[in-house]
Every structure is written in C-alpha cells, then in structure tokens.
C-alpha cells in the first residue's frame, strides 16, 4: 500500500472511530435522561420498573396527605381513578400542590410499590393539568368526574388550608 493511501485509510478510520464514540456518548446521555411516564394503574399492575427513575402522575387523593412533624418528609396517594400509588417525598412541596389536583412525581419505585420522589411538579393554574395526567384520567373515565367537580365549584385544599 502506498503512503498516500495508507494516510487516507488512517484518517478515515480515525473519523469513523471518533464519530462512533460521539454517537455512543450521545446515546448513553440520552438513555440516562429518559423518564418514562406511568399511571398508578400501570404501577400497581407491575408494568413500571423498580430502581429506575420514572414519572408517575394522577390526582392527589383527598385526605391522603401526611406530613412529618419533625422533618420535610411527606407521603400522599396519587390515583388515576382505578388504582392508587403511594408517593414518599422529602422536601418542600410546590405552592400549587393540593389534594384533588393533578401532579407528576419523578423518582424511583421501590420494591414495596412506594415511589420515592425527588421532584414533585404541580399544575400551574386552575385550568392546567399535565398532558400525561389528562390522558390517564381520560383512559380511566375519571376526567369527566374531575371536570364536573370543578364546574360545580368544588375546591380542594391541603391540610394547611392554602
């Protein structure tokens, strides 16, 4: 093989290896940032993976909010109308978090079926509900019940009355 051809081959191989490494790193980064959404029904049926970061959403069950008196630990139940999942969270809940409202929690599902959340997202005004939660409620037939309660002027408050 002549020197010019050998040099071109080395350059082409270096480019292929570089592009392959870049694609591999990009795919690895994207895979780590994927958070799949699961409804309480899917979680209760065992469809959600354990020890993997997931998103779970639904309506906060009325009367389910339990706050620790000596720490920022909070437990509450989220439902899609059919099944429920308990969520444990350590931190300050969003100002718009209320029982009976739609939320999305990000965290890892433990073997006991409790989602240990590291982030809780609440709807940002009275007319907004996360798209995943809306779809889950629509699929379970609970969206009409939720909308009827809002139309009748029903409001829900957390334990602090906010």
From Swiss-Prot:
It is found in: Cell inner membrane. The gene is ccmE. Residues 30-162 are periplasmic. GO terms for molecular function: heme binding; metal ion binding. Gene3D superfamilies: Nucleic acid-binding proteins. Residues 1-8 are cytoplasmic. The chain crosses the membrane at residues 9-29. Heme binds at residues 124, 128. This is Cytochrome c-type biogenesis protein CcmE. Residues 139-162 are annotated as: Disordered. InterPro entries: CcmE, CcmE-like_sf, NA-bd_OB-fold.
């Amino acid at each position: 093989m002549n020197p010019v051809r050998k040099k071109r081959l080395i350059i082409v191989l270096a480019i292929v290896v570089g592009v392959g490494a870049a694609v591999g790193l990009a795919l690895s980064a994207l895979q780590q940032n994927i958070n799949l959404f699961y409804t309480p029904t899917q979680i209760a049926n065992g469809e959600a993976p354990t020890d993997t970061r997931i998103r779970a959403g639904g309506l906060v069950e009325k009367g389910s909010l339990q706050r620790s008196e000596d720490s920022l630990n909070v437990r509450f139940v989220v439902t899609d109308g059919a099944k429920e999942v308990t969520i444990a969270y350590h931190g300050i809940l969003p100002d718009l978090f209320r029982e009976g409202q739609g939320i999305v929690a990000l965290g890892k599902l433990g073997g006991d079926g409790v989602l240990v959340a590291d982030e809780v997202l609440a709807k940002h005004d009275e007319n907004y509900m996360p798209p995943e939660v809306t779809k889950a409620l629509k699929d379970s037939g609970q969206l009409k019940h939720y909308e009827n309660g809002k139309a009748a002027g029903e409001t829900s408050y957390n334990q602090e009355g906010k």
